[in-house]
């Protein structure tokens, strides 16, 4: 294997620290071709789909990539903005907000970049940019508060894969999760409290997290437990009693059992249980995206209303709210200790 290296090391800057903020990713456009490229990269990740590669190759290329891109493109069109994909727009705004907060304290010694695990800007391209700037110390923050091998673990894989091709490795701090980080919990509580003060409360507040196959839990993935940990801390911060809130899991894919209760099934059943109004918040999504804007605010709204529900409200993600950016910047700063003078 040929390792990448540079003959001239005079450009190395021992003072500077690179901060890489990452999220899942998004297609370049809400079009079939762009969706096919994005889904191929996403669904080819063995962390995401843990079945034998030989079998999955045929399922992916002969079935999923033939059928799903067109349908997914239509869904993305419903949430696409003039600026582009909501996830990328908000992620870039988050990166800028974190940069401003850190540079106000540390100046140009901290360089912040944003990358996507799948799609653009890629993790590899941003790591290369850090290397080109002579940066030898890195902090990586995946914006998945609750750890799962399919998200946080996959992000580490991508970083490690890039490092495997290098001759000179940087110092690395990888923030693997933050499900109980007090500033994160407080930012969410303030956000929900402000929404409810303006719009009123509902019979039930539902915390909906992205689901994963149940077998991930059975094999030792802590995601299920960390989601419940976040929910419990958030409910406590809001002063909610047990009957006022619940945790559900959305976005299941395929025929196997995923973490339950399912969000869509819950929305269909709540009206029959006497719940006439519901508010949904997604603590695991740091930015609004297809899964929140289309799946929750559109699809699950329909499920609830068609089942007899009277009032459905989606409470937006924290996105680039100041309290959220303060929390993320503080989380990064906590991990800069020893990296800066």
From Swiss-Prot:
It comes from the Bacteria. Keywords: Cytoplasm, Heme biosynthesis, Iron, Lyase, Metal-binding, Porphyrin biosynthesis. It is an enzyme of class 4 (lyase). Fe cation binds at residues 210, 291. Pathway: Porphyrin-containing compound metabolism; protoheme biosynthesis; protoheme from protoporphyrin-IX: step 1/1. Its main location: cytoplasm. GO terms for molecular function: ferrochelatase activity; metal ion binding. It is found in: Cytoplasm. Its EC number is 4.98.1.1. Coiled coil: none annotated. The keyword Cytoplasm applies. Disulfide bonds: none annotated. One of its GO terms (cellular component) is cytoplasm. InterPro entries: Ferrochelatase, Ferrochelatase_AS, Ferrochelatase_C, Ferrochelatase_N. It catalyses: heme b + 2 H(+) = protoporphyrin IX + Fe(2+). GO terms for biological process: heme biosynthetic process. Catalyzes the ferrous insertion into protoporphyrin IX. Belongs to the ferrochelatase family. This is Ferrochelatase. It comes from Alcanivorax borkumensis (strain ATCC 700651 / DSM 11573 / NCIMB 13689 / SK2).
């Amino acid at each position: 294997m040929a390792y990448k290296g540079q003959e001239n090391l005079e450009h190395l800057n021992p003072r500077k620290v690179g901060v890489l903020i990452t999220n899942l990713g998004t297609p370049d456009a809400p079009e079939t071709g762009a969706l096919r490229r994005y889904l191929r990269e996403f669904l080819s990740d063995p962390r995401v789909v843990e079945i034998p590669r030989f079998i999955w190759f045929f399922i992916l290329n002969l079935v999923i990539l033939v059928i799903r891109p067109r349908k997914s493109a239509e869904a993305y069109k419903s949430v696409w903005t003039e600026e582009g994909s909501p996830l990328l727009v908000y992620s870039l705004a988050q990166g800028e907000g974190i940069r401003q907060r850190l540079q106000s304290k540390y100046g140009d010694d901290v360089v912040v970049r944003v990358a996507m695990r799948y799609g653009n800007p890629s993790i590899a391209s941003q790591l290369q940019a850090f290397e080109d700037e002579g940066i030898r110390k890195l902090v990586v923050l995946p914006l998945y508060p609750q750890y799962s091998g399919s998200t946080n673990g996959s992000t580490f894989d991508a970083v490690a894969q890039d490092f495997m091709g290098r001759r000179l490795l940087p110092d690395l701090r990888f923030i693997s999760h933050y499900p109980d980080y007090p500033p994160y919990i407080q930012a969410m509580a303030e956000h929900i409290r402000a929404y409810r003060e303006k719009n009123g409360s509902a019979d039930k507040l539902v915390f909906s997290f992205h689901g994963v196959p149940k077998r991930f839990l059975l094999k030792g993935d802590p995601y299920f437990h960390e989601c419940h940990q976040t929910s419990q801390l958030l409910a406590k911060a809001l002063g909610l009693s047990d009957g006022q809130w619940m945790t559900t899991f959305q976005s299941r894919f395929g025929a196997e059992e995923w973490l339950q209760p399912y969000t869509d099934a819950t929305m269909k059943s709540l009206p029959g249980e006497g719940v006439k109004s519901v508010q949904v918040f997604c603590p695991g999504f740091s930015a609004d995206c297809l899964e929140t804007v289309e799946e929750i605010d559109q699809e699950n709204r329909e499920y609830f209303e068609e089942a007899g529900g009277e009032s459905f409200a989606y409470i937006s993600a924290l996105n680039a709210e100041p309290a959220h950016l303060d929390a993320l910047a503080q989380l990064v700063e906590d991990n800069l200790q020893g990296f800066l003078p």
